[in-house]
Curated annotation (Swiss-Prot):
InterPro entries: Peptidase_U49_Lit_pept. The chain crosses the membrane at residues 61-82, 149-178. One of its GO terms (molecular function) is peptidase activity. It comes from Escherichia coli (strain K12). This is Cell death peptidase.
């Protein structure tokens, strides 16, 4: 098998339908009418895109194996990191050690491997003794949860690409590309979250998938890997625009998770999180403003 991520290919293909099953028939109509297909290629880079085949007027969403591996590795790290961080807080620990626990250490090792693989050959072997995706309902609990988060994240990314087709955006870079990316983000997020009421049980899981997708992109931008430079809005802007517009309950779980992960991603960039805000929404908003100022300098 080329990569353990291959276990999830079937689930990846069905994820845009399963993320919002109440709109499954509407999506099927779009996919059939626009002749949208998904293909997976082996190449380096986070180069997920849609291209048109003029000969049969079909639209092909292209996913790279390396990008799928990175998104899964990030989903796994996001889950493990936030769980261990929560335990550390409950224990009133003064310090949080990324290398102190094997569970977190292995997740961190996998994420670093996935980033390096993404930026080099794109076809390196999955590291042994690290977490990995398994067939459905197999593997460790962490692996299963990571795969669920991953599938929600990739569903939003696929809906983003489908939105380009639906909105009839030119599939080339133009002066309007950044605005078109904002429109595709908004269309995808509205498709997934738009018809849910605030207390709907599905809302948190879907919002977590969207948050994971944009935080994953942010993790690459922090490392100066500008895979989407000059064509997409900055990742911090996408976090704000796609998370803040849909309240996900009074406990603000998604905002809290985003704040914790951003705090980790920017821990070496002289950004201090103001934890005295009146809510996690305000704390996250202040943090994103600080990130904006940092990245614009």
């Amino acid at each position: 098998m080329r990569s353990p991520i291959c276990h999830l290919f079937s689930a990846i293909n069905s994820s845009p339908f399963k993320i919002a099953p109440e709109k499954e028939q509407d999506l099927k109509t779009i996919v059939d009418d626009k002749k949208i297909i998904i293909s997976v290629v082996s190449e380096p880079g986070f180069n997920i895109r849609v291209r048109k085949n003029e000969s049969n007027n079909s639209h092909e969403i292209v996913l790279t194996v390396a990008s799928l591996e990175y998104i899964w590795a990030f989903s796994n790290f996001f889950w493990v990191f936030t769980q261990e961080y929560s335990k550390s807080q409950k224990n009133n620990d003064e310090h949080f050690d990324l290398t102190g626990k094997n569970r977190l250490k292995k997740s961190d090792e996998l994420l670093k491997w996935a980033r390096k693989n993404l930026q080099t050959t794109g076809c390196e072997s999955w590291p042994k003794k690290c977490p990995k995706p398994e067939a459905y309902l197999q593997g460790s609990e962490d692996s299963q949860v990571a795969s669920e988060i991953f599938l929600c994240a990739i569903a939003w990314i696929l809906h983003h690409e489908i939105s380009h087709v639906v909105l009839q955006h030119p599939l080339v870079t133009t002066a309007f590309s950044t605005q078109e990316e904002r429109e595709a983000d908004s269309h995808a997020t509205k498709w997934i979250l738009g018809n849910l009421y605030e207390s709907a049980p599905e809302l948190k899981k879907r919002a977590l998938g969207i948050a994971t997708a944009v935080l994953c992109i942010q993790s690459l931008e922090v490392e100066n890997y500008f895979c989407l430079q000059n064509t997409h809005p900055a990742a911090y802007e996408r976090i704000y625009s796609n998370i803040s517009c849909y309240p996900v309950g009074n406990e603000e779980l998604i905002e809290a998770l985003c704040t914790v992960m951003l705090q980790y991603l920017f821990h070496g960039k002289n950004i201090n999180v103001n934890l005295d805000g009146e809510s996690f929404s305000s704390i996250l908003g202040d943090l994103l403003c600080d990130i904006s100022r940092l990245t614009s300098n």
